């Protein structure tokens, strides 16, 4: 199997316990360092790690019967990423993409007082795959999660990453939102959000 955008190994390590070999690919050195620690702790020795991005050459990465990509298709060239996934698969691909919900909840949107343009959703990928000759099956997964922040600055930076620039008035209002968030045991504040993810799967026809 090949896990693209493997992060710290949440999928790659369990897969490696069940399969003969797993290749895990991510561009983040920090994520891969944590994956190596998690791999050793799990006693897994059939997991190969590749420090690569979507745009790098994958010449050293072997093709696999199964290719997965969980929440790592937020790329500029979505069609190119889907094509690359499919080229590296012998049999089947799975990918999860955003379907509904957002990091920016109603409280943040109200504080900003303006509409935030949604990001391209899963339907773009479904249409692209259909055009490529791979009609995808779609299932939906609900997810409740959240992030913790040590201070308002971290929270503001997370919002800024999502929407771009913030005015001084935006920062003041968002600071009040942050101050009202529940605290965790270590004094950080937790922002909760809910998502719906689309699980896309498609097969490659045999030779």
Model-derived regions, located:
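Conserved beta-strand signature within the Rossmann-like core of class I S-adenosyl-L-methionine
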Residues: 90-100
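Conserved Class I S-adenosyl-L-methionine
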Residues: 137-207
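Short alpha-helix
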Residues: 118-133
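Short, glycine-/aromatic-enriched active-site segment of Class I SAM-dependent methyltransferases
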Residues: 98-116
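A short SAM/SAH-binding and catalytic strip from SAM-dependent methyltransferases
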Residues: 65-79
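Class I SAM-dependent methyltransferase SAM/SAH-binding core
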Residues: 10, 17-55
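Class I SAM-dependent methyltransferase "Motif I" SAM/SAH-binding loop
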Residues: 5-7
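Short conserved loop adjoining the S-adenosyl-L-methionine
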Residues: 56-61
């Amino acid at each position: 199997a090949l896990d693209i955008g493997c992060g710290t190994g949440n999928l790659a390590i369990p897969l490696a316990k069940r399969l003969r070999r797993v290749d895990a690919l991510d561009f983040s050195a920090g994520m891969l360092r944590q994956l190596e620690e998690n791999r050793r702790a799990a006693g897994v020795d059939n997991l190969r790690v590749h420090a690569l991005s979507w745009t790098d050459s994958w010449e050293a990465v072997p093709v696999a019967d199964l290719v997965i990509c969980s929440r790592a298709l937020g790329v500029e060239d979505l069609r190119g990423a889907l094509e690359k996934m499919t080229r590296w698969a012998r049999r089947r691909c799975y990918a999860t993409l955003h379907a509904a919900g957002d990091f920016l909840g109603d409280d943040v949107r109200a504080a900003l007082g303006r509409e935030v343009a949604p990001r391209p959703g899963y339907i773009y990928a479904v249409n692209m795959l259909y055009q490529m000759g791979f009609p995808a099956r779609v299932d939906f997964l609900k997810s409740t999660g959240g992030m913790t922040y040590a201070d308002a600055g971290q929270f503001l930076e997370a919002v800024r990453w999502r929407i771009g620039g913030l005015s001084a008035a935006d920062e003041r209002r968002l600071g009040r939102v942050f101050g009202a968030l529940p605290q965790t045991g270590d004094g950080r504040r937790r922002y909760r959000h809910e998502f719906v993810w689309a699980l896309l799967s498609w097969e490659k026809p045999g030779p």
